[in-house]
Each structure stands twice: as C-alpha cells, then as structure tokens.
C-alpha cells in the first residue's frame, strides 16, 4: 500500500529539500531541426515550461543560459533546453513521464518534431511509492512506446543492465535515430549515482546552518564540487534544512554545449548524490579520471555509473573511451555490463563498492523504512522505526514563477519570464 502524501508548505518562502528517493528518472528527447525556427525549443515560453513541470510534479526555481542552451534548477533536479534537445531529470516521487505529453504539445507548437528519445533510471529504493506511470519499468516502457515507438521501425528497445543480485540495476528505453547528420560526432554522457555518503562531509557542507552558512557558491567551493567543474558557470543551491543542487554550463567556447548537474540528499538512512556530465565529444571524455575525481570528493560507500555514447559509429569508438582502465582507489568493482543499442548507441554500466575499510566508519547507512530519519527534518517522525515512510513531497504549485535570492535560498517570485 502506498503511504499518504506528506503535506508540503514553505517556511518564509523557503522550499524544503527533496528527500527519500534520491534516484532520478531522466528523459532526453531529440528533435528534428526546423529551418524556419533556429531557436527551436528555446521558443517555448517560461509559462509553458512551468506548465510542463507542474504536470511532472516539480517546479523551476532558477535559470542560467548561454548561447547554446538554458539550464533550469528544479525543486526536484534539473531541466536543460537546447534548440533541438530537451533533457528532464527528476528525483523523489515526481511524475516525470506525466509531463511528456505537455512537452510534446508545446514543442509541436513551435514547429519541432521528435526524432529520438532515451529514458534512463537506476533501481528505486522504494518502488511501491512511485506514481502509477513509474510503478514498474514495464509500465514506463508501455508509456514510452505509446509516445515514441513510432520513431523506430518495429518500435523502441528496452534494456535492464546489471545483476539484481549484485545491487542496483540500470533501466534504459531508447527509440529513434541518434544523428540527424551522418558526419556528426558521437556524444557521451556520464551519470554517477552514489549512496552511503560520507557522514562528516555531508554534515559539514550540505546542512544549512545559520551560524556557518555563507552562500551556496561558498558551499560549492568548500565541498570540492567546484574542483570537479572548474570550466563551468555554476548555478547552485543549498536547500533548507539540507540538500544541494547545481547546474553547470561549460564556459569554454569550443565546449559550451556541455552541461553538468549534481543533486545531493544527505540525510541518514537515505543518503544519495548524483553527478552528471553530458553532451561531451567522445574524444574529450576521460571516464575513469572523472569518476575518480567525483569519488574523491564524495567518498561514497557505493556508487554506480553509466556511460552512454550516442552516434552512428558509437560502438566503434566506445572501446577507446572505456580502455583507460577501471581502477578507482579505495574501491572494488562489483559488476560491469556493456550493451549496444538497436538504434545507434552503446552504454556501459559499472558498480563499485568501498574496499578500504572506511565505509562502515564514515558512510551513512541506507536503512529500510527510514529508521534513521533526521529528527530535525520537517518530514521526520518522532518514532521513525514504527512509521510508514511518506512520499517525497510534491512541489508547491501556488507560485506563478520562481527565482532565488542572493544567498542561494529559493523563494517565490512573481516577475516576468525575462526577469526570472
């Protein structure tokens, strides 16, 4: 039985941090270019995007743009909008797929027609608390096939990578053509998902304490996150009472279509962090160097990561990308899986666990039924061990639009699209 949804309100206009189900759902939709609309999807208005996000049970709280795309921090994760690509990533019990019909409707209104979709997620910690469309991967696949199956002859393809006996699995649905131009270079994305986070690191950086908090930008630097993305303009948040999100836009002109995003749920019992780097030219990606850097900052007890390469010759170049070696200091590889897509792409999936003896001493135990819920959290229980775990709170829907104050705090905003 699904637990009742927790009531969500803001205190002094501050949005409570996402929690419980850290694992994100992610959809990437590519569209055909429109010669009469060079801005493509970026012509979809802010009000229309707000409607799309409301359908998915989340909100836009900030936006940062460059010449290539717009990056939105959401109440639960992130949205990226390019002229011919949209990437939506949401955590908790958000209803990501419920936002797809509205997205396609407004894309059609600006003359954009979908040509490829890729949906990914890891295993849910509490799948029984997910909304109906995400109740199982079969349910998700049925929905995706109804909306995107026509993009591939014979329909799309679905895959589950990794062994259920060895931990988290990776779920993937893909349909359509990866490249509009045959000479287009393959692009890579790398998603790192971490649990059992280092307790000391979380308590020091990702809990908003009035006596020590300076700004979200300072948190990004002090926590080590800035060192991972030195060439990125970062839009960052420290939520109250805890939690962290950021979007990064590469500042270098040669690579300014690259984006990154990090989301952290630091609470005892369900600690989780994700770190993504996407839209990278294959020859520029050093997979294991990047993962080693991420692991050195967060020091998780467990982590999984997926490297996805999309392009007409993705399978040919994937060996070079993954040949650098899989050694990560302090960790042992539990499993590795590689899968070629039926439609121009390949994915590799890895699971690593801490092997240096520090996991039990310094990592957060992810326990069943929220038995170690933080007492100070607005959705904790006096007797958590005997309580049903509630849904991750849905976003607050009564704000017309949103922005953030100078210190990185989220607050409601009633400005125009241009101002927000």
What annotation goes with each model-predicted range?
Residues 1-420:
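Polybasic/polar functional segments that serve as interface/processing modules
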């Amino acid at each position: 039985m699904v637990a009742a949804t927790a009531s969500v309100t803001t205190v002094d206009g501050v949005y409570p941090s996402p929690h419980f189900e850290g694992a994100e759902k992610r959809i990437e939709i590519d569209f055909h270019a429109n010669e009469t609309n060079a801005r493509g999807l970026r012509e979809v208005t802010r009000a229309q995007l707000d409607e799309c996000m409301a359908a998915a049970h989340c909100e836009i709280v900030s936006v940062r743009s460059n010449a290539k795309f717009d990056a939105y921090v959401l109440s639960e994760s992130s949205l990226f909008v390019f002229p011919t690509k949209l990437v939506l990533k949401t955590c908790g019990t958000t209803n990501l797929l419920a936002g797809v019909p509205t997205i396609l409707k407004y894309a059609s209104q600006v003359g954009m027609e979908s040509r490829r979709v890729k949906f990914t997620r890891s295993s849910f910690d509490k799948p029984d608390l997910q909304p109906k469309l995400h109740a199982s991967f079969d349910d998700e696949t049925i929905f995706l096939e109804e909306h995107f199956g026509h993009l591939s002859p014979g329909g799309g393809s679905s895959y589950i990578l990794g062994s259920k006996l060895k931990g988290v699995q990776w779920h993937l649905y893909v349909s359509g053509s990866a490249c509009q131009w045959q000479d287009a270079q393959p692009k890579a994305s790398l998603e790192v998902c971490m649990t059992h986070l280092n307790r000391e690191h979380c308590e020091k950086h990702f809990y908003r304490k009035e006596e020590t908090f300076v700004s979200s930008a300072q948190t990004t630097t002090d926590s080590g996150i800035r060192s991972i993305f030195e060439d990125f303009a970062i839009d960052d948040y420290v939520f109250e009472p805890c939690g962290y999100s950021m979007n990064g836009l590469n500042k270098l002109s040669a690579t300014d279509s690259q984006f990154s995003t990090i989301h952290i749920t630091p609470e005892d019992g369900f600690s989780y962090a994700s770190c993504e780097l996407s839209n990278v030219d294959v020859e520029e990606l050093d997979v294991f160097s990047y993962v080693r850097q991420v692991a050195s900052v967060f020091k998780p007890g467990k982590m999984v990561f997926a490297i996805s390469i999309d392009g007409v010759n993705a399978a040919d170049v994937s060996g070079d990308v993954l040949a650098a070696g899989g050694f990560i200091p302090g960790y042992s590889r539990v499993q590795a899986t590689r899968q070629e897509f039926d439609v121009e792409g390949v994915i590799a999936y890895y699971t690593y666990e801490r092997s240096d003896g520090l996991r039990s001493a310094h990592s957060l135990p992810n326990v069943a039924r929220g038995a170690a819920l933080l007492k100070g959290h607005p959705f904790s229980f006096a007797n958590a061990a005997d309580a049903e775990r509630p849904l991750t709170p849905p976003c607050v829907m009564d704000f017309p639009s949103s922005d953030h104050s100078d210190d990185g705090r989220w607050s409601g905003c009633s400005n125009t699209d241009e101002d927000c």
